């Protein structure tokens, strides 16, 4: 269950950002999780509650945005979303493609801190490499 270590990394990264902002607690952590990330959202939510206890994130909640899989199709010269993880073929022309453009994400995208303010993580200088993002294996064409 790697979700426990991922939850710990989320608490570490979000807690560090909250401290940098001078916040004493965090109310909400916003995540973007790709369908190919290998993360089970239910297990992550359970693990997060455990590791967030007795930290400035205790009692906070995770809001998870599900990121669908998208591939690039060379013949169509377009990016297409896929309906699932078991068929990496262009939904328009049926060409196989392993050129995955979305779906591996594991990103903290924002925080709501104790004063009600929201922070967009894209505007912050932060390192989320500890989260283990994009560790899904390459899917051959």
Curated annotation (Swiss-Prot):
Binding site for Ni(2+): 2
UniProt-listed GO biological process terms: protein maturation; protein modification process
Entry similarity comment: Belongs to the HypA/HybF family.
A GO molecular-function descriptor: nickel cation binding
Family matches, as PANTHER family: HYDROGENASE MATURATION FACTOR HYPA
Endoplasmic reticulum listed as a keyword: no
Keyword terms: Metal-binding, Nickel, Zinc
Name used for this protein in its record: Hydrogenase maturation factor HypA
InterPro entries per UniProt: HypA/HybF
Protein role: Involved in the maturation of [NiFe] hydrogenases. Required for nickel insertion into the metal center of the hydrogenase.
Residues reported to bind Zn(2+): 73, 76, 90, 93
Xref: Pfam families: HypA
């Amino acid at each position: 269950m790697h979700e426990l270590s991922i939850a710990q990394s989320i608490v570490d990264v979000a807690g560090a950002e909250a401290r940098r902002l001078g916040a004493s607690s965090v109310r909400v952590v916003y995540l973007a999780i790709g369908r190919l990330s290998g993360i089970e959202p239910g297990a992550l939510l359970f693990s997060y509650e455990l590791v967030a206890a007795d930290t400035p994130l205790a009692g906070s909640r995770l809001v998870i945005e599900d990121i669908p899989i998208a591939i690039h199709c060379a013949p169509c010269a377009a990016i297409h979303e896929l309906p699932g993880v078991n068929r990496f073929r262009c939904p328009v022309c049926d060409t196989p493609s392993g050129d995955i453009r979305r779906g591996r994400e594991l990103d903290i995208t924002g925080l709501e801190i104790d004063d009600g303010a929201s922070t967009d993580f894209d505007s912050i200088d932060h390192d989320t490499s500890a989260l283990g993002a994009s560790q899904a294996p390459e899917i051959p064409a």
